[in-house]
Amino acid sequence: MIQKNSRLVVADNSGAKEVLVIGILGGTRRRYANIGDVVVVAVKSGSGGTVKKHDVLKGVIVRSKSGIRHENGSYIKFYDNALVLLKEDLSIIGTRIFGPVVRELGKKFSKIVSLAQLVL
């Protein structure tokens, strides 16, 4: 579960390395976000690219330490919390996705699943 003030790793090549969650979209009193949810983030560190430090963007969570339950009953947990940065129209900024993602993302964000190195 990701909440406000959580720091996440960026899993694409947009130029940002680490972000801070400043809002969770989808309700007025929403406290937690899971895999597939859209959050508002502030860039905390980066390597210079499309995205600069202190930019405020949207992102979709692709990996979480708390994990996700598949339809067949199995659970998948990851070693880090990661997200992919999005533009205002919810299209991805980067052109590559690093690390594994879950196949449940394909329902809303099929582009992320098609660019991912490994789909679980």
UniProtKB/Swiss-Prot annotation:
InterPro entries: Ribosomal_uL14, Ribosomal_uL14_bac-type, Ribosomal_uL14_CS, Ribosomal_uL14_sf. Keywords: Ribonucleoprotein, Ribosomal protein, RNA-binding, rRNA-binding. Binds to 23S rRNA. Forms part of two intersubunit bridges in the 70S ribosome. GO terms for cellular component: cytosolic large ribosomal subunit. One of its GO terms (biological process) is translation. Belongs to the universal ribosomal protein uL14 family. This is Large ribosomal subunit protein uL14. It comes from Phytoplasma australiense. Part of the 50S ribosomal subunit. Forms a cluster with proteins L3 and L19. In the 70S ribosome, L14 and L19 interact and together make contacts with the 16S rRNA in bridges B5 and B8. NCBIfam families: rplN_bact (TIGR01067). GO terms for molecular function: large ribosomal subunit rRNA binding; structural constituent of ribosome. Pfam families: Ribosomal_L14.
